[in-house]
Amino acid sequence: MSKVTVYSKPNCPQCTQTKKKLEQKGIAFEVIDISQDKNALQHVLDLGYRQAPAVVSGEKHWSGFRPDLLSAL
C-alpha cells in the first residue's frame, strides 16, 4: 500500500472524519497541518484543491471527506 498523507487544518470536521475513517480501517497515515506548513499548502493548491482535507495516496489524490475512496484504500 502507498503512503497516505492527509493535508489537514484545525477545526475541520471533514478532516476529522477522514482521519477517523483511516484509523477505523487500520491504515497508517501522516497528517500535515497546512495552516502551519506553507510548502504543504502550496502543494495542495498545485494539486488543484481549495478544500481540506486533501488526501494523497501514491498517484491517487482527492479533497474532502470521501468514504468511497477511503474504503478503496
Model regions: which residues?
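Local sequence-structure signature of Cys/Sec-based thiol-disulfide redox active-site neighborhoods
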Residues: M1-K25
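ATP/adenylate-binding site constellation spanning eukaryotic-like Ser/Thr protein kinases
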Residues: K9, Y49, P67
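Residue-level detector of anion-binding/catalytic polar loops
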Residues: A28, R50
